[in-house]
Amino acid sequence: MDWKKLNVCLADANNELPKPSMLRKSLFKDQRMDDLYREIIVERYKEPLYRGTLDPHDITFEDENPLCGDHIRIDLRISDDNKVTEAAFSGHGCAISQASADLLLESVIGKSLDEIRQMTKQDVLDNLGIDLGPVRLKCALLPLKVLKAGAYGLGEATDDILEE
C-alpha cells in the first residue's frame, strides 16, 4: 500500500489526517472502512515504521502480556523541552500489539511527556480504527501501558496506569 498517496487522499485543508475512528464514522458506514483498517494493521505489523531500538535513548521501558506472550520494549529520545524527537519499539507478539505499537509511536513524535501521560485507551482505539474484544484490547493497550510507564519513570507497569 502506498501510504503517501493514501495520506494525500485523506488529508483535510490543513494537511491533517483524520483519526481512523472519525473517518470510519463520518465517511463510510460499511465493511470497506473496516477492511481498510484491517489492511493497515496487517501492513504495519509486516512492515513497521518504528521497529528498532535507540542507542542512546533517554527513556526505555518494556513489559509483556502474560496471557498471550506479547512483549513490547519502547525507546524514546527526548529534547531539552521534554518532547519526543525519536521513538522505536522492539519485541514480539500478535499483529494487533505490534501494529498498535507502531501506530502509537507515530502519534507521539513531537508530543511532550505530559501529553503522553494524558493519553487514553481511546487514543489507541482511534489509531487502530477497529472494534476489539476484551482479549485483543489487552494486546492493543500493551504499547500504551509501556509508553506511559516510561513517561512516568515507573519501575513497573500496572493496568492502573491506563486509567490515569
Where are these regions (language model features)?
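Solvent-exposed residues in well-ordered beta-strands and their adjoining turns
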Residues: R77-S79, S90, I109
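C-terminal binding/interaction regions
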Residues: D2-G52, K111-D114, M119-E164
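Catalytic-loop motifs flanking and including active-site residues across diverse enzymes
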Residues: I96-S100, C139-L142
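A short glycine/serine-rich beta->alpha loop
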Residues: F61-E62, T85-G93, D126-R136
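Alpha-helical support elements that line or immediately flank enzyme active sites
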Residues: S100-K111
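Short, thiol/selenol-centered motifs that function as redox-active sites or metal-ligating centers
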Residues: C68, G91-A99
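Structured beta-strand/loop patches that form or line metal/cofactor-binding pockets in enzymes
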Residues: E43-E86
